[in-house]
Swiss-Prot record:
Family from the record: Belongs to the universal ribosomal protein uL2 family.
Gene Ontology MF: a single term: transferase activity
HAMAP family: Ribosomal_uL2_B (MF_01320_B)
Keyword Chloroplast in annotation: yes
Protein known as: Large ribosomal subunit protein uL2cz/uL2cy
High-level lineage: Eukaryota, Viridiplantae, Streptophyta, Embryophyta, Tracheophyta
InterPro entries: NA-bd_OB-fold, Rib_uL2_dom2, Ribosomal_uL2, Ribosomal_uL2_bac/org-type, Ribosomal_uL2_C, Ribosomal_uL2_CS, Ribosomal_uL2_dom3, Ribosomal_uL2_RNA-bd_dom
GO BP terms in the entry: mitochondrial translation
Pfam families assigned to the protein according to its UniProt record, in alphabetical order: Ribosomal_L2, Ribosomal_L2_C
Region listing for Disordered, in residue ranges: 225-274
Keyword annotations: Chloroplast, Plastid, Ribonucleoprotein, Ribosomal protein
CC per GO annotation: chloroplast; mitochondrial large ribosomal subunit
Subcellular location(s) of the protein: Plastid, Chloroplast
Subunit annotation: Part of the 50S ribosomal subunit.
């Protein structure tokens, strides 16, 4: 994709970059209204996820994570921007007349053909079961439960690796560094999700961040004691604790938040590293 760099005429345009070729032109049958009213609050109106609120209105695009159009070739017609995710999406026209959106694989261009099913070619954008893939294949949009659609490695630039197959299970290395077992009957898409450098793109100004629904981040040390354990004091005061904590008093620099005795504990061979 072509990246347009702004000429530095104001402080807000310094280092600002946008994608000049990716537009949003959704199809009416593949979108519906998305009413997001929580803004980081729970049913009682209490903030449970900070720094969320505002943002531009959005229409949700129906993404085909299941890839259940078996053995029917499809053609990439457009590559579009999706306001609901960092990755781009592709509009696919299948041979039977079906039209669907899928995640844009890295390197795919308009006019490429894709297919899903068993014993299909190991080609970027094709979807097939893990049992039919060779070891070392880079994959994304991976199912956890057979037939439920892809759940893992769906963010921009995400990619997992098939490292082993034994018995009824396949061993995958996920983008987080976690190594876990998944049924070989589950399907995945070959390749890496596109828009790899999205985290390195500079928005240029605070207003662009607000359009995405992300509000300013405030340090706890400048808050009042009622709002944060670090708050209070006269002037610039230290936090008054041995270690920093979250607004709810939990250790801020590392605390295990995973539920104990979760059903998938036996499937995880190595913990994630990030």
């Amino acid at each position: 994709m072509a990246i347009h760099l702004y000429k530095t005429s104001t402080p807000s345009t310094r280092n600002r970059a946008v994608d000049s070729q990716v537009k949003s032109n959704p199809r009416n049958r593949l979108i519906y209204g998305l009413h997001c009213c929580s803004k980081g609050r729970n049913a009682r109106g209490i903030i449970t996820a900070g720094h969320r609120g505002g943002g531009h209105k959005r229409l949700y695009r129906k993404i085909d994570f299941r890839r259940n159009e078996k053995n029917i070739y499809g053609k990439i017609v457009t590559i579009e921007y999706d306001p609901n995710r960092n990755a781009y999406i592709c509009l696919i026209h299948y041979g039977d007349g079906e039209k669907r959106y899928i995640l844009h694989p890295r390197g795919a261009i308009i006019g490429d053909t894709i297919v899903s099913g068993t014993e299909v070619p190991i080609k970027m954008g094709n979807a097939l079961p893990l049992t039919d893939m060779p070891l070392g294949t880079a994959i994304h949009n991976i199912e956890i439960t057979f037939g439920k659609g892809g759940k893992l490695a769906r963010a921009a630039g995400a990619v997992a690796k098939l490292i082993a197959k034994e018995g009824k299970s396949a061993t995958l290395k996920l983008p987080s560094g976690e190594v876990r077992l998944i049924s070989k009957n589950c399907s995945a898409t070959v390749g890496q999700v596109g828009n790899v450098g999205v985290n390195q793109k500079s928005l240029g100004r605070a207003g662009s961040k607000c359009w995405l629904g992300k509000r300013p981040v405030v340090r706890g040390v400048v808050m009042n004691p009622v709002d944060h354990p670090h708050g209070g004091g006269e002037g610039r005061a230290p936090i008054g604790r041995k270690k920093p904590v979250t607004p709810w008093g939990y250790p801020a620099l590392g605390r295990r938040s995973r539920k104990r005795k979760k059903y998938s504990d036996n499937l995880i061979l190595r913990r994630r590293t990030k």
